[in-house]
């Protein structure tokens, strides 16, 4: 933890600086950040898995304890109100004793409904940040998730501190071990369900601890972009494997995708071509580049692949202009990554939250920012055989440019996606995923 502890001091200083600046602009006394509360299932006595408010875990790695609060004003030592009830039914979180605790004035809260006793007396001039607006109202907050504060914090969250970058490297390092285990399980005949167990065991995290529901897709299931079902039986014929899975470290996420062919064939060659294209796109990343331009460059590469692999006829630019590439590559190239998998700030032009919309022809693009140092983004081009989208091409003249025989041959394989997590530096790109061991 020495390196994290070293970086953490500067991380807290930067968060305090941001808070002080926005409080001065908005004439607020401070921010009260709520970790969140348990959500109970309807007509039940069981709670949904708890997920901490990302604004809360930006300050400290308390991820699994509801009813905690942070009181920050950018000047004084931040106060952590740590929930530690007297409870013989459930495990009670230990009093924190890690490198980060020296930066907080820690108060223990034994009853969640007594938190008002720990909050500032002039609460009306403090802003509440969190999900539970009804609780905030009862406590007397008149400013609840104010737009100006949220926009400012979201814009700056895209610029990661050295502490955050190190957490994300470790999240990648953990996920890489899971991907290697999953790949091995695939080639040894495991089912989707069994591959999932191999992955979770390798990363040492439960389904509730990884940052999102893993996509473990064999064969044609790989054509379902957000496939989260897990078949318990192995397919009669093993063709392909797409895995989109990450890991968490101190609240920060990794988000990695790989695709494998079971045998050497045309689909395997298509994976090789996509891998080459993805690395070329990453080489294009640098400060000052518009992320939508990278997305458009991806469509140009997908168009060339459609031609090279006899999936379509015509010229590459025409395939893009007619929307044919969008039927094979319907999602965005990638997104901001950090405390959340689809991290905030991807559409923010400035601190005021001016929104830069995705291009009309590419509505699913999740980032329209100009790249800058210390941003972390995913790069995840893909190519899929999705019948619902391809059927739209059949309805007009575009269908005449598709080689439906090749489509039929590739349909059982589902699709391809290759995704790395990349830090933009001033003079280079750091592909965390590959540099930490997932080279193919």
Curated annotation (Swiss-Prot):
<dbReference type="InterPro" id="IPR048819">
    <property type="entry name" value="PepQ_N"/>
</dbReference>
<keyword id="KW-0482">Metalloprotease</keyword>
<dbReference type="GO" id="GO:0005829">
    <property type="term" value="C:cytosol"/>
</dbReference>
<dbReference type="InterPro" id="IPR000994">
    <property type="entry name" value="Pept_M24"/>
</dbReference>
<dbReference type="GO" id="GO:0008235">
    <property type="term" value="F:metalloexopeptidase activity"/>
</dbReference>
<dbReference type="InterPro" id="IPR022846">
    <property type="entry name" value="X_Pro_dipept"/>
</dbReference>
<dbReference type="GO" id="GO:0102009">
    <property type="term" value="F:proline dipeptidase activity"/>
</dbReference>
<keyword id="KW-0378">Hydrolase</keyword>
<comment type="function">
    <text>Splits dipeptides with a prolyl residue in the C-terminal position.</text>
</comment>
<dbReference type="InterPro" id="IPR036005">
    <property type="entry name" value="Creatinase/aminopeptidase-like"/>
</dbReference>
<comment type="similarity">
    <text>Belongs to the peptidase M24B family. Bacterial-type prolidase subfamily.</text>
</comment>
<dbReference type="GO" id="GO:0046872">
    <property type="term" value="F:metal ion binding"/>
</dbReference>
<dbReference type="Pfam" id="PF21216">
    <property type="entry name" value="PepQ_N"/>
</dbReference>
<keyword id="KW-0479">Metal-binding</keyword>
<feature type="binding site">
    <location>
        <position position="255"/>
    </location>
    <ligand>
        <name>Mn(2+) 1</name>
    </ligand>
</feature>
<feature type="binding site">
    <location>
        <position position="380"/>
    </location>
    <ligand>
        <name>Mn(2+) 1</name>
    </ligand>
</feature>
<dbReference type="GO" id="GO:0004177">
    <property type="term" value="F:aminopeptidase activity"/>
</dbReference>
<dbReference type="InterPro" id="IPR001131">
    <property type="entry name" value="Peptidase_M24B_aminopep-P_CS"/>
</dbReference>
<keyword id="KW-0464">Manganese</keyword>
<keyword id="KW-0645">Protease</keyword>
<protein>
    <recommendedName>
        <fullName>Xaa-Pro dipeptidase</fullName>
        <ecNumber>3.4.13.9</ecNumber>
    </recommendedName>
</protein>
<dbReference type="Pfam" id="PF00557">
    <property type="entry name" value="Peptidase_M24"/>
</dbReference>
<dbReference type="GO" id="GO:0006508">
    <property type="term" value="P:proteolysis"/>
</dbReference>
<feature type="binding site">
    <location>
        <position position="335"/>
    </location>
    <ligand>
        <name>Mn(2+) 1</name>
    </ligand>
</feature>
<feature type="binding site">
    <location>
        <position position="255"/>
    </location>
    <ligand>
        <name>Mn(2+) 2</name>
    </ligand>
</feature>
<dbReference type="InterPro" id="IPR052433">
    <property type="entry name" value="X-Pro_dipept-like"/>
</dbReference>
<keyword id="KW-0224">Dipeptidase</keyword>
<dbReference type="GO" id="GO:0016795">
    <property type="term" value="F:phosphoric triester hydrolase activity"/>
</dbReference>
<feature type="binding site">
    <location>
        <position position="419"/>
    </location>
    <ligand>
        <name>Mn(2+) 2</name>
    </ligand>
</feature>
<dbReference type="InterPro" id="IPR029149">
    <property type="entry name" value="Creatin/AminoP/Spt16_N"/>
</dbReference>
<feature type="binding site">
    <location>
        <position position="419"/>
    </location>
    <ligand>
        <name>Mn(2+) 1</name>
    </ligand>
</feature>
<feature type="binding site">
    <location>
        <position position="244"/>
    </location>
    <ligand>
        <name>Mn(2+) 2</name>
    </ligand>
</feature>
């Amino acid at each position: 933890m020495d390196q994290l502890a070293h970086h953490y001091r500067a991380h807290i200083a930067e968060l305090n600086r941001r808070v002080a600046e926005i409080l001065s602009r908005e004439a607020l006394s401070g921010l009260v950040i709520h970790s969140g509360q348990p959500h109970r299932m309807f007509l039940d006595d069981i709670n949904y898995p708890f997920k901490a408010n990302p604004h809360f875990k930006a300050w400290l790695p308390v991820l699994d304890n509801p009813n905690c609060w942070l009181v920050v004003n950018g000047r004084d030592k931040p106060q952590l109100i740590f929930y530690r009830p007297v409870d013989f039914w459930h495990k009670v979180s230990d009093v924190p004793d890690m490198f980060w605790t020296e930066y907080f004035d820690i108060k223990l809260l034994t009853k969640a409904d007594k938190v008002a006793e720990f909050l500032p007396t002039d609460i009306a001039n403090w802003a509440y940040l969190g999900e539970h607006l009804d609780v905030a109202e009862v406590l007397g907050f008149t400013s609840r998730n104010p737009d100006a504060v949220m926009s400012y914090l979201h814009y700056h969250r895209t610029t990661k501190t050295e502490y955050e970058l190190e957490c994300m490297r470790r999240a990648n390092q953990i996920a890489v071990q899971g991907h290697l285990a999953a790949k091995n399980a695939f080639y040894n005949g495991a089912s989707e369900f069994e591959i999932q167990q191999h992955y979770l065991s390798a990363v040492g995290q439960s389904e509730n601890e990884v940052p999102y529901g893993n996509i473990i897709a064999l064969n044609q299931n790989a054509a379902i972009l957000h496939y989260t079902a897990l078949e318990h039986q192995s397919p009669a014929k093993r063709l392909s494997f797409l895995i989109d899975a990450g890991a968490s470290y101190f609240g920060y996420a990794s988000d990695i995708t790989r695709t494998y062919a079971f045998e050497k064939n045309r689909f395997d060659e298509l994976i090789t071509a996509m891998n080459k294209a993805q690395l070329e796109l990453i080489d294009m990343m640098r400060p000052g580049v518009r992320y939508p331009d990278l997305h458009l460059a991806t469509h140009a590469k997908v168009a060339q692949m459609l031609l090279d692999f006899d999936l379509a006829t015509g010229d590459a630019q025409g395939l893009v202009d007619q929307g044919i590439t969008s039927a094979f590559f319907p999602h965005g190239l990638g997104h901001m990554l950090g405390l959340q998998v689809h991290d905030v700030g991807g559409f923010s032009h400035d601190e005021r939250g001016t929104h830069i919309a995705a291009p009309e022809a590419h509505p699913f693009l999740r980032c329209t920012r100009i790249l800058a140092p210390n941003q972390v983004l995913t790069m995840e081009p893909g190519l899929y055989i999705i019948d619902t989208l391809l059927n739209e091409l059949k309805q007009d003249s575009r269908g005449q440019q598709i080689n439906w025989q090749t489509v039929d041959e590739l349909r059982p394989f589902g699709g391809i996606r290759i995704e790395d997590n990349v830090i933009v530096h001033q003079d280079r790109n750091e592909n965390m995923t590959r540099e930490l061991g997932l080279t193919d």
